[in-house]
């Protein structure tokens, strides 16, 4: 066995660190403008999904990431319901280079938040007396790569607020 000696101070750990601190709903809304009449119609829905992510640096090495899912469902030409959730998380992220930090905030964290947002939307929709809303998984890595390509072509640099 070998003994390692230190000068009394713990060696500083510069290895990358990531941990979830909190997952929470930041905002939630549901509108069914044509109820109760919409419930008496034949159900032939069309679904439009819009998603967006935002991130901002908090104190120290903490970051907030917010995933917004907005769903508009029409039955024929009429809006059956509009539902939106802002699912947020606070993450401790340390010792990452700029590229890894950008990817973590732009793809990895939204991947963590998506199942929570999807379940919240589904619960909200069924409580509104509509059929379950089964959203397909989203490839945030591909969306992140597309956004980085778009920014590169536009001569923009990724930023972390």
UniProtKB/Swiss-Prot annotation:
Gene3D superfamilies linked to this entry: SecB-like
Keywords: Chaperone, Cytoplasm, Protein transport, Translocation, Transport
Pfam family membership, one: SecB
A GO MF term: unfolded protein binding
InterPro entries for the chain: SecB, SecB-like_sf
UniProt key word Cytoplasm: yes
GO cellular component terms, semicolon-separated: cytoplasm
A GO biological process held by the record: protein folding
NCBIfam families: PRK05751.1-4 (NF004393), secB (TIGR00809)
Quaternary data: Homotetramer, a dimer of dimers. One homotetramer interacts with 1 SecA dimer.
Family: Belongs to the SecB family.
Record protein name field: Protein-export protein SecB
Species assigned in the record: Pseudomonas putida (strain W619)
């Amino acid at each position: 066995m070998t003994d390692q000696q230190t000068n009394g101070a713990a060696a500083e750990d510069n290895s990358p660190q990531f941990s979830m601190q909190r997952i929470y709903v930041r905002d939630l809304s549901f509108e069914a403008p044509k109820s109760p009449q919409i419930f008496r119609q034949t159900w032939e829905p069309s679904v439009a999904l819009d998603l967006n992510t935002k991130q901002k640096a908090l104190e120290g090495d903490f970051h907030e990431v917010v995933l917004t899912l907005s769903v508009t469902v029409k039955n024929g030409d009429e809006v059956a319901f509009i539902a939106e959730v802002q699912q947020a998380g606070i993450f401790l992220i340390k010792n990452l280079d700029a590229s890894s930090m950008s990817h973590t905030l732009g793809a990895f964290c939204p991947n963590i938040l998506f199942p929570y947002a999807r379940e919240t939307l589904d619960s909200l929709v069924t409580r509104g007396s509509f059929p379950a809303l089964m959203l397909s998984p989203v490839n945030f890595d591909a969306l992140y790569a597309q956004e980085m390509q778009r920014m590169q072509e536009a001569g923009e640099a990724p930023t972390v607020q």
